[in-house]
Amino acid sequence: MRRRRKMEAGAAARAWSLLWLLLPLLGPVCASGPRTLVLLDNLNLRETHSLFFRSLKDRAFELTFKTADDPSLSLIKYGEFLYDNLIIFSPSVEDFGGNINVETISTFIDGGGSVLVAASSDIGDPLRELGSECGIEFDEEKTAVIDHHNYDVSDLGQHTLIVADPENLLKAPTIVGRSSLNPILFRGVGMVADPDNPLVLDILTGSSTSYSFFPDKPITQYPHAVGKNTLLIAGLQARNNARVVFSGSLDFFSDAFFNSAVQKAAPGSQRYSQTGNYELAVALSRWVFKEEGVLRVGPVSHHRVGETAPPNAYTVTDLVEYSIVIEQLSNGRWVPFDGDDIQLEFVRIDPFVRTFLKKKGGKYSVQFKLPDVYGVFQFKVDYNRLGYTHLHSSTQVSVRPLQHTQYERFIPSAYPYYASAFSMMLGLFIFSTVFLHMKEKEKSD
């Protein structure tokens, strides 16, 4: 028996020793960041776009670089996604390698994956089809966005090196960043949004003088995109909170554009020592890869005022208190969300109560009186704001009518009816008394 105990103790000690030896090896695996597949036209893009990729690595992203026609490409294996994010920096690809195609990427988006796409004037059919799936329509191949009033001084003469003003950005700090930006350099293909798709976001538009056409041909027909309808960068947040960003310019993410000075060719234009491309690219990547604008619901509670636990059923006209915790992802940590426009609805089929929630400490709460209607209701919070994930919380409760012992003996509002009833009784009594005791006069012959 002693020998067995010694053997078991020795085995346990060896197991603990082995575990401590494996911990350093397991640590990097557990601490790895979001798995991101990067598809490139050629691997040289790792050098020409190194600043953007370095910003992702500095945020602990695990990047896997492959050419877009690599025969070993795969997004899904045994029904599970191999990556959390997808970056497509291969605008000219005609066919993806391996088992990746537009349908696979659409399935990846439907599964909640995030996709960042950069196109150019040499755009292939796969990216065009992917854009159509997401409500974005690219212009024809070899076309470019042209602006004869807002081009850079270093433009070669076709006026396709566009200087986009920060005023043309979407007014959503969660998506484009909260700091003021310098003008943005853009050279690439134009896009237009599907007017029937309310999920498409016009992140960066062209100026009123921009249009999309072949830069080396005279204009013989109305351009595909004109003025503010010309999209330079567009986004999409699907109903399942999956996010996609389309940029019409691959050069937008390049080191050359990040470090370039920028100045409009118009006389008297201000010169900036650096573009705002880097700051905008980082902000877009943080949003599309769900580092910004991600909300979640924490504990939810409801009870009568003065109590702490929810009842089996509420009674009509009860005074209740509802509270909910809403958190936001910030720098990898969940912190309390700060908002002043969160509403609560008390819904049966239609809302009977709609009121704002007020922040108290780390939660949002409100007190209100239940309607004088019984049935099955829901406490519903449906928060859908630009740049944030769709937040939804519903809690079902029952509301019953008053019990017989809970009604008032006399209802003040019914006093007129009481008076009419008693007056009717009194009148009937007087009439009966008079009628019974009244003696008719005898008729004389």
Curated annotation (Swiss-Prot):
It comes from Canis lupus familiaris (Dog). Residues 1-32 form the signal peptide. Residues 33-415 are lumenal. InterPro entries: DDOST_48_kDa_subunit, OST48_MD, OST48_N. It is a single-pass type I membrane protein. Residues 437-445 are cytoplasmic. The gene is DDOST. It comes from the Eukaryota. Belongs to the DDOST 48 kDa subunit family. GO terms for cellular component: oligosaccharyltransferase complex. Pfam families: OST48_MD (PF23358), OST48_N (PF03345). This is Dolichyl-diphosphooligosaccharide--protein glycosyltransferase 48 kDa subunit. Keywords: Endoplasmic reticulum, Membrane, Signal, Transmembrane, Transmembrane helix. Component of the oligosaccharyltransferase (OST) complex. OST exists in two different complex forms which contain common core subunits RPN1, RPN2, OST48, OST4, DAD1 and TMEM258, either STT3A or STT3B as catalytic subunits, and form-specific accessory subunits. STT3A complex assembly occurs through the formation of 3 subcomplexes. Subcomplex 1 contains RPN1 and TMEM258, subcomplex 2 contains the STT3A-specific subunits STT3A, DC2/OSTC, and KCP2 as well as the core subunit OST4, and subcomplex 3 contains RPN2, DAD1, and OST48. Subunit of the oligosaccharyl transferase (OST) complex that catalyzes the initial transfer of a defined glycan (Glc(3)Man(9)GlcNAc(2) in eukaryotes) from the lipid carrier dolichol-pyrophosphate to an asparagine residue within an Asn-X-Ser/Thr consensus motif in nascent polypeptide chains, the first step in protein N-glycosylation. N-glycosylation occurs cotranslationally and the complex associates with the Sec61 complex at the channel-forming translocon complex that mediates protein translocation across the endoplasmic reticulum (ER). All subunits are required for a maximal enzyme activity. Pathway: Protein modification; protein glycosylation. GO terms for biological process: protein glycosylation; protein N-linked glycosylation via asparagine.
